[in-house]
């Protein structure tokens, strides 16, 4: 267990600088203080070893968090950079219930499914939480044959009896379209990625439905597929802009990839946002990823949702449940400065 310098300093009422000098074997600290620091480290290590021993004695098996990579267009970045805070919380939750926590990435193109299934059987894995955004229904069949509880994140295999924890994509897109229409926009175009996954399919269906409900025309003719990388989206968006914007006053941006690629093309042409073109995005972006643009955003919850799914899986291991559930997490609309209120200025 790695103990942070600031935690040692706080526990021993020393300055972080003093602790750093001791740990790096630097001069300037008296022997009594050095001894206090090293004694504390030994004490913490003994306590940690005892904790591990107790956990091993009480261990009921392992819970696996499995990220399933089909093509890598959506989950590749997550797989390469796991969310440490989420995994720390999941590991703690599993430990409290007497289970080990394990994280694994399966690449469909290069991995061997039979080896993965054999490994799951041999490792005393009691349940699996799937990061399943890229999966299709047939992908889940081999795992169902393991006859252990599973919970699905970011997908829906309801008819197969698998519980799911999802962002309410339809509610989010409805919220976004309504926001634009209420601001006076009707010529709205939906910018999409090329890949078909569950989350995107739900968003596209909701766009078509809400455009019809709000009497804004046929949404199927207002959908433009641009690509699956920021560069591909940027190039396709430039080609679209070369043909000029015909009546279009607002774009709904399907994902962070679309947002980054499309806004780059728009801003390079000095198109004024929001006066000439309004934008509303789906999914959060890193801070300052688009300098000078405060994007209006439809935001889902991810960390809390996946942690709740893991807690539900643990309950499934201890309680008999006959019902199949699907839990939708509502989105939030975060107002930025990227949507022009046409109604406010209609008479100006």
Stretch-by-stretch model annotation:
Residues 1-59:
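N-terminal helix-turn-helix DNA-binding module of bacterial transcription factors
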Residues 46-116:
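Amphipathic helical "hinge" segments at domain boundaries
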Residues 71-85, 103-111, 165-175, 191-238, ...:
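Hinge/beta->alpha junction and helix N-cap segments in small-molecule ligand-binding domains
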Residues 111-125, 233-247:
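Short, well-structured alpha-helical segments in soluble
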Residues 131-172, 257, 283-295:
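Flexible loop/hinge segments that line or gate small-molecule binding clefts
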Residues 186-187, 218-221, 273-279:
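Short acidic capping loops at alpha-helix termini that bridge into adjacent secondary structure
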Residues 240-348:
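Flexible loop/turn connectors
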């Amino acid at each position: 267990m790695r103990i942070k310098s600031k935690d040692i300093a706080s526990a021993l009422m020393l300055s972080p600088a003093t602790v750093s000098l001791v740990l790096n074997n630097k001069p300037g600290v008296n022997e009594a203080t050095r001894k206090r620091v090293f004694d504390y480290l030994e004490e913490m290590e003994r306590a940690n070893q005892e904790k591990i021993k107790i956990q091993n004695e009480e261990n009921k098996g392992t819970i696996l968090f499995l990220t399933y990579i089909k093509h890598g267009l959506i989950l590749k970045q997550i797989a390469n950079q796991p969310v440490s805070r989420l995994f720390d919380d999941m590991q703690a939750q599993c430990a409290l219930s007497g289970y080990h926590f394990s994280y694994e990435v399966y690449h469909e193109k290069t991995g061997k499914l039979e080896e993965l299934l054999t490994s799951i059987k041999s490792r005393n894995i009691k349940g699996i939480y799937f990061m399943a955004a890229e999966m299709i229904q047939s992908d889940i069949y081999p795992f169902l044959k393991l006859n252990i509880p599973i919970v699905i994140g970011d997908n829906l295999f309801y008819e197969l009896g698998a519980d799911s924890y999802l962002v309410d994509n339809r509610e989010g897109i409805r919220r976004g379209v309504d926001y634009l229409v209420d601001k006076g926009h009707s010529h709205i175009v939906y910018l999409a990625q090329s890949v078909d996954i569950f989350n995107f399919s739900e968003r596209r269906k909701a766009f078509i439905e809400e455009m019809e409900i709000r009497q804004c025309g046929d949404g199927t003719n207002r959908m433009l597929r641009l690509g699956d990388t920021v560069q591909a989206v940027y190039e396709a968006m430039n080609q679209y802009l070369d043909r000029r914007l015909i009546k279009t006053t607002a774009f709904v941006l399907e994902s962070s990839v679309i947002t980054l690629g499309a806004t780059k093309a728009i801003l390079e042409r000095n198109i004024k946002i929001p006066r000439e073109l309004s934008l509303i995005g789906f999914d959060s972006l890193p801070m300052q990823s688009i300098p000078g643009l405060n994007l209006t955003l439809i935001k889902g919850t991810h960390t809390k949702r996946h942690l709740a799914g893991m807690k539900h899986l643990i309950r499934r291991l201890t309680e008999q449940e006959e019902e199949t559930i699907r839990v939708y997490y509502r989105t939030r609309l975060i107002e930025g400065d990227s949507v022009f209120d046409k109604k406010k200025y209609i008479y100006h």
